[in-house]
C-alpha cells in the first residue's frame, strides 16, 4: 500500500495512456477518460493484468489477483478513467481493496 500524492496520480495516468497508446497503436492524444477499453481502443482484460504487474513492480506491492478479480466483479472497468481510478485504489489499498465499497 502506498500513500498517493499528485505526482503518483499523474504517473499512473501517463503509464496507462502510454501503455494503451503503444498496445493499441494510437496516439495518447486520442485516448480520453471516456474511451472504452474494448470498443474504442480494441483492448482486452490481459492488458489490465499487464498494467497491474507494471504497477506492483513500480510500487513494490504484493497483490493477490483473486482479490482484484473479486473487487472488479463488483466494480467493472470499461473506460480508461475507470481503469486509472482502479489502479490508484490498488496502489493505495493493496489487498485491502476488497474491503472498500
Model-derived segments and spans:
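Phosphopantetheine-dependent thiolation modules in NRPS/PKS and related acyl-activating systems
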Residues: 2-43, 47-53, 57-101
Amino acid at each position: 500500500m502506498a500513500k498517493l500524492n499528485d505526482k503518483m496520480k499523474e504517473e499512473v495516468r501517463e503509464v496507462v495512456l502510454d501503455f494503451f497508446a503503444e498496445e493499441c497503436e494510437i496516439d495518447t492524444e486520442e485516448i480520453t477518460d471516456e474511451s472504452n477499453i474494448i470498443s474504442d481502443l480494441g483492448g482486452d482484460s490481459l492488458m489490465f493484468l499487464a498494467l497491474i504487474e507494471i504497477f506492483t513492480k513500480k510500487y513494490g506491492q504484493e497483490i493477490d489477483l483473486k482479490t482484484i478479480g473479486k473487487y472488479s466483479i463488483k466494480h467493472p472497468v470499461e473506460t480508461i478513467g475507470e481503469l486509472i481510478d482502479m489502479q490508484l485504489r490498488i496502489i493505495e489499498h493493496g489487498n485491502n481493496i476488497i474491503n472498500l465499497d
